[in-house]
Amino acid sequence: MSKSYIGAVLRGIIGLAVAAALTLPVRAETLADALAAAYVNSGLIQQNRALLRAADEDVVIAASKLRPILQWSSSVKRSLSSGRIGSNGVYQSSDSTSTVASAGLVAELLIYDFGASKLAVQVKKEAVLGTRQKLLSVEQKVLIRAVEAFTNVRRDTEKVALRRSNLSLITEELRAAKDRFDVGEVTRTDVALAEARLAGSRSALAAAEGTLRVAVEEYRAAIGHAPKALNGSDKVSKPVKNLDAAKAIAVRQHPDIKELQHSVTVAELTLQQAQLAKKPIVKLSGSYGLTETLTSRAYGRSGEIKLQATGSIYQGGQIPAFVRQSAARRDAARYGLNLAALAVEQNVATAYARLQVATAEKEASELQIRAARVAFLGVREEAALGARTTLDVLNAEQELLDAENNKVSALADQQIASYKLRSSMGRMTADLLGLDVPKYDPEEYFSLQENAPAVSEQGKKLDRLLKSLGKK
């Protein structure tokens, strides 16, 4: 191997070190930074928070039936009439006008409906709790997408760097092969082999750069801004000791299961509502009205208080059908919960296995790199002594590159698998990850709306926030 080749390699290493030093002043973006940005910038999370607000309002709407209802009405009527009256040929005109104004108040209060209205409120509250769990599920999806985007950009950036380094090495190898050909140490075949390998390296670099550009755009969509200098740790912690512990945590904590548990409760309460449909409803109502003829100053007042009970005798089989339908939906919800538990356990097992595979691949790739590096250095030295051909050097170099690529991919797979295992357990939320983000408390808005039928200041602020996001 020529001295010019070794010198070029050293110059390349020094150049990379200088370039790295120049980038040090730029603050690196960590995975935690990226996750926090994805959480804050996610329109999907904001959308589901709005849906949660809508579900909160359903509780207020249902509770309004337990409160008094007060309505008013008013009207002004102008009447005109004209004609001619008389007899025996004697007639006279008769014209009259009148203006009548009226106003009234009507009040109504539910006295007793055997708990049907209270059940309706409980149904909506359970729906709210289920929607909260759905929001957590969406949050998990947003954050795991951010992990994948961050890790893929790091992986593809390192692969581009490896491809560029490989291109530089093969370029020097080609130059060395030409120098040796000029002095008769190798044949034209050796030069052609190096040229072919150089063309392949350029093609691979172009493909790697294209993959990186795709990863950058996905990062921009998932995180909310273009990637900066990314700084991630190669150390991956195992989020749980063993598979059984992971499954136990997932069954207890996964938001998908909790959401379906609330759905089962909703279905059970809805069945109870349907069973109460035949029960009578008792209401108390009262009204007061005032009517005045403005043209004659005549007036009248009226008022009444009424206690009314109503109930269903026969509706063509509608009520029993509702009961059977609600029972079927309850059964379907229970089966759905069982299926979800099985699916969650399967996802946990799959994620756990993938983490084990990625960990094993990373360890194997490290051994592969050490062996391939020793082989490459040995082949290169032997080639300098004439005991190896250019093809041997190129093949050894390719094996080292493949080993390094395998390690980069294995590290990325291990990182993603670790967080996917967290997600499958239901522990991939901003709160559990300890992200530095504004804490969102769904209970705060719910409490305000539950006791305040009018729009609260919190609701107005959220409306303004959603409008600003819509303008963007």
State what each model feature region is.
Residues K3, S409-K472:
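Acidic, low-complexity, intrinsically disordered peripheral segments
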Residues M1-Y5, K141-R252, S263, A274, ...:
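Periplasmic alpha-helical coiled-coil/stalk elements that build and connect Gram-negative outer-membrane
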Residues L24-A28:
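Sec/Tat signal peptide C-region and signal peptidase I cleavage site
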Residues V76-S82, I111, Y288-E292, G311-I313, ...:
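Transmembrane beta-strands of outer-membrane beta-barrel pores
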Residues S81-S96:
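Flexible, solvent-exposed loop segments that connect beta-strands
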Residues R11-T23:
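Bacterial N-terminal signal peptides
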Residues A36-Q46, R53-P68, T97, G104-V123, ...:
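A glycine-/polar-enriched beta->alpha junction
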